[in-house]
Amino acid sequence: VVLLFGAAVLRFHLAWWRGHLGDLLVFQSWAVGTDRMKWFREVQHLGNFFPNYPPLYPSLCRLLVWIHEAAALPGDIRLPIDDMTLEESRPIILLFKTPPIAADLAAAVIIFLWGRHERRPGLGLLVAAFYLFSPAILYDGAYYGQTDTILLALLIGSGFAYATRRPVLLGSSAMLAALLKAQAISVLPILAAAVIIEWRHVWQRRFAELFLGAALSFWAVLALAGLTGMLHLFYNGYFTIVGQYSRTSYNALNLWWIIHSPLDRRPNLADFPADSLRVAGLVTYRDIGLALFAAALALTIWRWRRAADRPASLVLACAASAWAFFNLCTEMHERYSVVAVGFTCLAALWERKWFAFGLLSSLTTMINITLACHFWYPPCRWLQFHLNWFLHADSPGPFLAISAIQVLMLPLVLDALWRTGSRGRTPAVNAR
């Protein structure tokens, strides 16, 4: 309780400051409606930023607006979040940062329960604290105000439900993850394959409960989307997102950054070509990225199928898949490695070396995120300046170094998955 309280206080303190006002304004426009916002002429361009999420999060944002209006909470919900309105908008900024903060706390509770299930309650508490104060987790949710840590919490919940044989929770949390962000594809195929692989031994007789959990979440989100007018996002959130940020890398320090970054100057977005361009007139960069991700995913599933240490190897497989998604696919944003960082930190529950690698990858991800969301922190200008050091780099060296670390996380996790040993055909974890 003390740990959760301290983590919550720190998060709300960070949330009070600027964050990414552009993304928060977009969330606000989805929730309120551009035509209902003040300064309509100044914000009508946001109509071009139609919701490109599945229905869960935009519906939740609109629900937050209704709660704010009904409860007469502080702040003008219709005043656009902007630099000029920053002081007046702080209560609204806090409002839109509350979901990721709540998700972080929930994920920590799940990690602690997972540790207790593994008969490692002390280590579970330590890993939960490690997760809560992980730089990338803190920065992406509480400061930036983005949704990646919400997705991460749902995926960790799905992994916990799988490992502890809770079919209703597994179906429910996996469905919520899919309805939150299309980027859930970074991990959900691993969990789906795991269910199929252990179908006869474990999940066949629990299919009704698994289906019930998924159905409950789906119908709840469907009802919420209908209530909030977001039903069209069942299409927009999945079928309009590919190509919207058509570059090989969109601030993501990954394999594509290394390939296309200039070596004689600081790189910028214009250096990264559209991923729809064809290589040698045959296939597009996007096709190559998807093929590489599919190959890495298939390799990970094949290896996990024979892994001996099922709880630990499942987490490593999820981490490997998430790192493959971030490093190999095109159109990646800087924060899409947050899911990979979370599972890397979680792996410390079984092997303590992941404390070091989890911290390293969390720091590189946080630094990567500052490319898009600079740290603004008036209480300590020294911290603000040094956390933004990456922005002042004139040469490509620091960018390439961080890219290399993040790319190398994939073979590192795959190697650890290989070292978990092999088993026979009998599942390592019996059904309970």
Question: Where are each of the predicted segments found?
Answer:
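Membrane-interface transmembrane helices that cradle and orient dolichyl/undecaprenyl
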Residues: 116-122, 156-169, 199-201, 307-309
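Aromatic/glycine/proline-enriched transmembrane-helix motif characteristic
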Residues: 11-12, 117, 241-327
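Extracytosolic helix-loop segments that constitute the early lumenal/periplasmic catalytic or substrate-binding loops
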Residues: 25-59, 63-81, 230-237
